[in-house]
From Swiss-Prot:
GO cellular component: cytosolic large ribosomal subunit
Name this protein carries in UniProt: Large ribosomal subunit protein bL19
Keywords: Ribonucleoprotein, Ribosomal protein
Organism taxonomic ancestry: Bacteria, Pseudomonadati, Pseudomonadota, Alphaproteobacteria, Hyphomicrobiales
SUPFAM superfamilies, A to Z: Translation proteins SH3-like domain (SSF50104)
UniProt record similarity statement: Belongs to the bacterial ribosomal protein bL19 family.
Length: 126
């Protein structure tokens, strides 16, 4: 293990102790609360959309969230360990068979919907 990997691992461990990141993947609908700086004030802005992919690993990991705003598709890439991310919440799990959902960029309307993943009721009650 070289020095850079060792430093990244130390930073990742330090940030992981303070931040709780839920398990989510492509197809999941997430709400990302982002800290926005406006002049001297900072506020938290919620960004809700479908996670269309995750890339990287460790300290350099990021994920892309896509939403439709006023009929226009908007994508935003968030670093997982960014200090600008206040929290991440998973709203619903999606049933997909791909790691990258870039094909959603071409789809409109009902065809762009993702089926919700069914959870096993027996496992949920125990």
């Amino acid at each position: 293990m070289n020095i850079i990997q060792q430093l990244e691992k130390e930073q990742f461990d330090k940030l992981s102790a303070t931040k709780t990141i839920p398990e989510f993947g492509p197809g999941d609908t997430v709400i990302v609360n982002v800290k926005v700086v406006e002049g001297e004030r900072t506020r938290v802005q919620a960004y809700e959309g479908v996670c269309i992919g995750r890339s990287g690993g460790g300290l350099n990991e990021s994920f892309t969230v896509r939403k439709i705003s006023y009929g226009e598709g908007v994508e935003r890439v968030f670093p997982v360990m960014s200090p600008m991310i206040d929290s991440i919440k998973v709203v619903r799990r999606g049933k997909v068979r791909r790691a990258k959902l870039y094909y959603l960029r071409k789809l409109r309307g009902k065809s762009a919907r993702i089926v919700e993943k069914k959870t096993d009721r027996a496992a949920a009650t125990n």
